Amino acid sequence: MAHLPKEYDFSIESLGESKIPSPIYLSHTLGDFIPNYVSDNEYISHELSARLGETVGPFTHKNLMERAGPRQKIFFNPHHVHAGIVTCGGLCPGLNDVIRAIVRCLWGRYGVKRISGIRFGYKGLLPDYNFDILPLTPEVIDNCHKTGGSLLGTSRGGGNRVVDIVDGIERLNLHILFIIGGDGSQKGAKEIADEIKHRNLKISIIGIPKTVDNDISFVQKSFGFDTAIVKATEAVAAAHMEARSQINGIGLVKLMGRESGFIATYTAIASHETNFVLIPEVSFDLDGPNGLLAHLEKRIALRKHAVLVVAEGAGQDLMVNADGVPSGDSQGGSLRVSSGTDASGNKRLADIGLFLKEKIGVYFKEKRIHINLKYIDPSYLIRSAVAAPIDSIYCERLGNNAVHAAMCGKTKMIIGLVHNKFVHLPIDVVVCQRKHVNPEGSLWRDALDATGQPIVMKNII
């Protein structure tokens, strides 16, 4: 019987047939030392694993991912194109690098001279806010990669006002809109593309996935993630130095990761100084003989210091009682679990960092064991950082491939890296689920080896 991966439809929507010769001079010939065009019949499979004795296939354009890159024929006449760029959601290292790459490729490779920066996220397309449009030229974006944040500004929310947003796109007479944003922003991009199709407009919507949590499905790595690991590792190094310099010192570092613990996991492996890493995907007990606090006590007794790294979404089940108030916090206070979601559609979380800080302090006080705990939350220092060189390279390539896709009339898609190849991915497939750390996979196993923590910190009932 054929061994098939779970069925997904990776077909990419197009505005029509590409008939215009590309202004980029490339080749189809191997061995002539000229970069080659990419054909629309070049694909890769999202599933690499196979089992002996089982056949793989059949393959179609639906279960294969379309290769990204410049085509020989394009859909839009570059001299007629008006392109827009918008950044949505929170800050992330590399935003300006992506903007710069898009502008330079449009202007320098395709000859597109009308490029508009939409200010402050989706709200920049809404008439209520009346934000100015920022004309983008090579001179404007030349040095923007040297600073963090977003040249265009950003905001959360507004993406649910799809009709108003498409009205704004029409008012600006945009032919292409590049949407740089995370899961919530790309869900908005999907709705925008659907409304554009409903109106029978020839406007390309191209997403560039932005999430420092690295939780976009199918995408191997999100831009800014490598920079986040660099900065997070620096925070852990500081926590370790504080901990080992004190009597029974404990360093507690809270990192980003609402539903996926990739930053915490990679940081634990990279730092070589983390003794416990806690992520949303792996539940743990606080109390009891096999709980976190008992194991932390053993670590302090043995080595006289400890470092804990916790993702912001970890341990949420420990903080909520039947009344919706975090356990150990009868007054509610800063740990209270807020109902509903934020402007980006994310579920509001209780603060696991402050919760653990309090619980650790109470536990050792009751045990009459002196500790010196230092708590570090570097989240906004990480988000606003300038992209590391490895991320700058990635952002440049993401931006270039996004432009190539848009000029060919591709739409309702994002650019992603899969198996080290840039591909086109349909937005509706990407946003249907989030990527998580597999508790039974090799990454988490390696993290456990790096920290030396127990494989399971749950009490057997």
UniProtKB/Swiss-Prot annotation:
Highest taxon of source: Bacteria
Residues annotated as catalytic: D213 (proton acceptor)
Site annotation Important for substrate specificity: residues: G184
Substrates-to-products reaction catalysed: beta-D-fructose 6-phosphate + ATP = beta-D-fructose 1,6-bisphosphate + ADP + H(+)
Keyword tags: ATP-binding, Cytoplasm, Glycolysis, Kinase, Magnesium, Metal-binding, Nucleotide-binding, Transferase
PANTHER family cross-referenced by the UniProt entry: ATP-DEPENDENT 6-PHOSPHOFRUCTOKINASE 1
Protein known as: ATP-dependent 6-phosphofructokinase
Lineage per the UniProt record: Bacteria, Pseudomonadati, Spirochaetota, Spirochaetia, Spirochaetales
Protein encoded by which gene: pfkA
